[in-house]
Structures are given as structure tokens and as C-alpha cells.
């Protein structure tokens, strides 16, 4: 395979893990970061100890503080940053891009102020003439396991399947299997909203409830995700795949999950500010819960689990009381019409 340069915007765990994959595939990954300490550590020690402890990076993984240097000559630009920085980084990227480029984003969230998905934010901020294609790379994955080269599957979603196949070809190897799909909306809705349900799973575990409770929460949570997704144009079948139920399972059941860990602390009685300070990293589900709270009301979508998690996060609702209210809701038939 011909070596290709790929720029990765974001020196966190996911950006660094994807850079490792590209280096394993004999490509040339360049990470753009904004902290001297991390950029220097990647270049000099071939580690990123804050985000991926104990992982030794291939020497081919390089990092830079210069956005221009990172994207110069890159076939693909991967945007691997927290959702709250997406708009400002895309403004910078729009200024820096000199020619049409395949853009890939791996950020899972909804912009609270606008209810926009991340691809919509990117489309607003980056000129169409500079976007050869926009691909969502998502699925059941923890960066820690990708960096350890454990078997993982993802889905590259794009309206232009030929662009999705280019991304598939650059990242696929014996450890990372990539599928393609054309349902961008479904991939983004599944990836963003599962973080809310993962907070709920963590809360349930923190309260000491068992597997029955978590299984119910995940299953009915998936129904809520699908309801909203279909209402905004997703294919319901997408939620049965990697970017739907697959991503939900891994995020609700693993100690690697920031959202599960944050929820677990909340369930044990800590308040949100304490939890976020202890985490020291972005917990996307908190921001997404705020966005979806208003969005669901606007669309008149029934999302009782999501609403309960919002109330725990932002209205000081007691977690046990929230569970009692969910369990005491009016009886219903388990049937969805899509």
C-alpha cells in the first residue's frame, strides 16, 4: 500500500490511538496538539502518558503544535477533539486548508446551543470547496484497547461510499476491522446519545443495582435513541449495528468508559462538579444530556430515561427517587413504530 500522510487534530487518547493504527499500516500520521508537554513527549519519548499510560508509540507517529505543518500534504484530516471545541477548531481548519481534503471526525456529541450533530457543525464552519468528503468514524471502541491492538470493529459512514472506502482502506488491519455505511445521521445519533445511557448505567451500578436493572436501562435506552434518530432522518436499522447497539454495549459495561465512571460516582452520592473535577477529562454525556433534553421536548419525543438522567445531572434529583419514578410509570406495550 502506498504510504499516505494523515493529519490527526487532537492529541488525546483517541487521536493518539488512531495515529498508532495508521503507523502500523505504514502510513504517516501527524498529530496536531496544543500542549508543548504532550507534543514533546510524543516526539521524544514515543509515549502519551496522560492519555494512554504504558503504551509505546511507533516512532513513525509524530506530533506538532503547528496546524499548517500537520495538514500540509495530508490526504485525510481526522478531527479527534471534544465536541465543545469542534466549532473553534473547524474555524481554524477552514483558514488553514488550501485544497479539498477528506475530513473524518470521531467526536461523539451534540452541540447544546443548536442541537447540531458534529458533521453539521463541520459543514457550517468549513467551506464546501475544501471538503472533498466528510466521514464519521464510529463504533464500539475504547482507545486504550485499540492502542493495545485488541480486536476492534468500527464503521466509516459517509453519503459518498467511495470516500468511506478510502478511510476503510487506510485504517483496516488484522486488529481493526472497518465496515462502511451511508447513514451519517444514524452513526452520529447513536454515538452521541449512548453516552447519556452510559451515565445511567454507571449511576445504576453506583446505586448497587444489578445486571437486571442495567439490561433494562440499556434496552429501553436504545429504544429512546432510535426514536429520536428516526425522527431526524436515521435508518432504524443503523441502531442495530456497530454505531448503535454495539457502541451502547461497550460504553455501558466497561470501566474504560468515562461516562460510565462518571455515572458510577454520581450513583455513589458525589455531585456533578466533584465528579467532573476528579475525571480530569471530558465527559461527553453530560453535555449531550443537556442538548437532548431540549431537543426531545422540541420534537415531542418520549425519552423518560434521558429526562431522568438530565434531572439527576442538572436538577439535583435524587438518583434512587429517579429510578422509582421510572419504575412507577404507566404500563405500556413494548412496541415501536418506525
Curated annotation (Swiss-Prot):
State the pathway, as annotated in the record: Membrane lipid metabolism; glycerophospholipid metabolism
UniProt keywords, alphabetically: Cytoplasm, Lipid biosynthesis, Lipid metabolism, NAD, NADP, Nucleotide-binding, Oxidoreductase, Phospholipid biosynthesis, Phospholipid metabolism
User: What GO molecular function annotations does the UniProt record carry, in alphabetical order?
Assistant: glycerol-3-phosphate dehydrogenase [NAD(P)+] activity; NAD binding
Tell where it localizes: Cytoplasm
Catalysis performed (reactions): sn-glycerol 3-phosphate + NAD(+) = dihydroxyacetone phosphate + NADH + H(+); sn-glycerol 3-phosphate + NADP(+) = dihydroxyacetone phosphate + NADPH + H(+)
Q: Extract the signal peptide range.
A: none
Gene Ontology CC entries for this record:
cytosol
The record, for InterPro entries, names: 6-PGluconate_DH-like_C_sf, 6PGD_dom2, G3P_DH_NAD-dep, G3P_DH_NAD-dep_C, G3P_DH_NAD-dep_N, NAD(P)-bd_dom_sf
Which residues take part in binding NADPH? 13-14, 108, 143, 258, 282, 284
Cell cycle as a keyword of this entry, yes or no, is: no
Query: Which residues participate in sn-glycerol 3-phosphate binding?
Result: 108, 139, 141, 194, 247, 257-259
Q: Does the keyword GTP-binding apply?
A: no
Enzyme Commission numbers on file: 1.1.1.94
Biological process per Gene Ontology, one example term: glycerol-3-phosphate biosynthetic process
Q: Where is the active site?
A: 194 (proton acceptor)
Which domain of life does the protein's organism represent? Bacteria
Q: Write down the Pfam families for this protein, in alphabetical order.
A: NAD_Gly3P_dh_C, NAD_Gly3P_dh_N
Family as reported in the entry's similarity comment = Belongs to the NAD-dependent glycerol-3-phosphate dehydrogenase family.
Q: What does this protein do?
A: Catalyzes the reduction of the glycolytic intermediate dihydroxyacetone phosphate (DHAP) to sn-glycerol 3-phosphate (G3P), the key precursor for phospholipid synthesis.
Q: Give the protein's recorded name.
A: Glycerol-3-phosphate dehydrogenase [NAD(P)+]
Chain's gene name? gpsA
Amino acid at each position: 500500500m502506498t504510504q499516505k500522510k494523515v493529519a490527526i487534530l487532537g492529541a488525546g487518547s483517541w487521536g493518539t490511538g488512531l495515529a498508532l493504527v495508521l503507523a502500523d499500516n505504514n502510513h504517516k500520521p501527524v498529530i496536531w496538539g496544543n500542549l508543548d508537554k504532550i507534543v514533546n513527549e510524543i516526539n521524544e519519548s514515543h509515549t502519551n502518558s496522560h492519555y494512554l499510560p504504558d503504551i509505546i508509540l511507533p516512532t513513525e507517529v509524530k506530533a506538532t503544535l503547528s496546524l499548517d505543518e500537520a495538514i500540509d500534504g495530508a490526504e485525510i484530516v481526522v478531527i479527534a477533539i471534544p465536541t465543545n471545541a469542534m466549532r473553534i477548531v473547524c474555524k481554524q481548519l477552514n483558514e488553514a486548508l488550501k485544497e479539498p481534503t477528506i475530513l473524518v471526525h470521531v467526536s461523539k456529541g451534540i452541540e447544546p446551543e443548536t442541537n447540531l450533530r458534529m458533521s453539521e457543525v463541520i459543514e457550517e464552519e468549513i467551506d464546501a470547496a475544501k471538503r472533498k468528503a466528510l466521514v464519521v468514524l464510529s463504533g464500539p471502541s475504547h482507545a486504550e484497547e485499540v492502542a493495545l491492538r485488541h480486536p476492534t470493529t468500527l464503521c466509516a459512514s459517509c453519503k459518498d461510499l467511495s470516500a468511506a472506502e478510502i478511510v476503510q482502506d487506510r485504517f483496516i488491519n488484522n486488529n481493526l476491522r472497518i465496515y462502511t455505511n451511508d447513514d451519517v445521521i444514524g452513526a452520529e445519533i447513536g454515538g452521541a446519545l449512548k453516552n447519556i445511557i452510559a451515565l445511567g448505567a454507571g449511576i445504576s451500578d453506583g446505586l448497587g443495582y444489578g445486571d437486571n436493572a442495567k439490561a433494562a436501562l440499556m434496552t429501553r435506552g436504545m429504544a429512546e435513541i432510535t426514536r429520536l434518530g428516526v425522527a431526524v432522518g436515521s435508518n432504524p436499522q443503523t441502531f442495530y449495528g456497530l454505531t448503535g447497539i454495539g457502541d451502547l454495549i461497550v460504553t455501558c459495561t466497561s470501566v474504560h468508559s468515562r461516562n460510565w465512571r462518571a455515572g458510577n460516582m454520581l450513583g455513589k452520592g458525589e455531585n456533578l462538579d466533584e465528579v467532573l473535577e476528579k475525571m480530569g477529562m471530558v465527559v461527553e454525556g453530560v453535555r449531550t444530556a443537556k442538548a437532548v433534553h431540549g431537543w426531545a421536548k422540541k420534537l415531542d419525543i418520549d425519552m423518560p430515561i434521558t429526562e431522568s438522567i438530565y434531572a439527576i445531572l442538572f436538577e439535583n434529583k435524587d438518583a434512587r427517587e429517579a429510578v422509582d419514578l421510572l419504575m412507577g410509570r404507566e404500563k405500556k406495550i413494548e412496541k415501536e413504530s418506525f
